């Protein structure tokens, strides 16, 4: 009984450290609009998801990482859906491309999209 209690406490602490919620079961149904309190987690490992950016007039700023440069809205931003079931976190780009990882051992999936990112320069106006 003590072991079960200890593992339960350890699981709750891991969720708080990783920024994951302590909702019933910790599950998140597939969504393109994850809870605000989870953006820090999701946008760290797949920064090209549209829900990570706030865009106006073709210029976008990252909602989570304020030190990121402004970017030009282009094909770098993808319409992602994210989901979580037990310890499996999934990013789906809707075109058959998806990335699955252990939520407690996340792996960034930013590289495929980095080539498309265009940093905003004042001369671009």
From Swiss-Prot:
<dbReference type="GO" id="GO:0044423">
    <property type="term" value="C:virion component"/>
</dbReference>
<dbReference type="InterPro" id="IPR004848">
    <property type="entry name" value="ASFV_fam_110"/>
</dbReference>
<comment type="similarity">
    <text>Belongs to the asfivirus MGF 110 family.</text>
</comment>
<keyword id="KW-0732">Signal</keyword>
<dbReference type="Pfam" id="PF01639">
    <property type="entry name" value="v110"/>
</dbReference>
<feature type="short sequence motif" description="Prevents secretion from ER">
    <location>
        <begin position="122"/>
        <end position="125"/>
    </location>
</feature>
<feature type="signal peptide">
    <location>
        <begin position="1"/>
        <end position="29"/>
    </location>
</feature>
<feature type="glycosylation site" description="N-linked (GlcNAc...) asparagine; by host">
    <location>
        <position position="65"/>
    </location>
</feature>
<protein>
    <recommendedName>
        <fullName>Protein MGF 110-4L</fullName>
    </recommendedName>
</protein>
<dbReference type="GO" id="GO:0044172">
    <property type="term" value="C:host cell endoplasmic reticulum-Golgi intermediate compartment"/>
</dbReference>
<keyword id="KW-0325">Glycoprotein</keyword>
<comment type="function">
    <text>Causes the redistribution of lumenal ER protein to an enlarged ERGIC compartment.</text>
</comment>
<keyword id="KW-0244">Early protein</keyword>
<keyword id="KW-0946">Virion</keyword>
